[in-house]
Amino acid sequence: MVWASDLVQLGDGKPRCGWVSDDPLYRAYHDEEWGRPRRDPSALFELLILEGCQAGLSWITILRKRAHYRKVYDGFDPARVARYMPKKIESLVVDPGIVRHRGKVEASVGNARAWLALAAREDPVAFLWSFVGGAPKVNRPAGLKQVPAKTPESEALSKALAKLGFKFVGPTICYAFMQASGMVDDHVAGCACAG
């Protein structure tokens, strides 16, 4: 994607990463969530599912649907999502409040099962964070062109998750997940949220 500028100044005058729009939801996401380290298993599971659902769409589309996703996906409780039967899957596929893509809905259920299998073996939080050495990787790119779509770490995470049975976890999706979960901090230099 091409942005007009590496930084934008919205109504409050604070400089932000150039991908942020004046949409209050998007601005709050950028300021309060994106690039902030998360180690809560529920939050990480939710992000992994939502990033997969976002594939091919804009993130603001998912943000606008997130509250409804939380409702119909039982608060992203992997134990509950893993038990979804065909009737529940069909109801999700026709629900206008989420992305109505059968493959993504079915992948969400399969990913919940894969998450539970991983959790039975080891701590999923430690597993996910191990791909960045257990600590946030702060990149501080000079501009948006320096923000990669994928990295060797996201490629390794993608391969590991796929091996465990996860779907919609390609290296680009995994990098977006790493950014969203704060495993990677790619706020551009000059952004008010750049630590």
What are these regions (language model features)?
Residues 1-195:
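HhH-family (HhH-GPD) DNA N-glycosylase catalytic core used in base-excision repair
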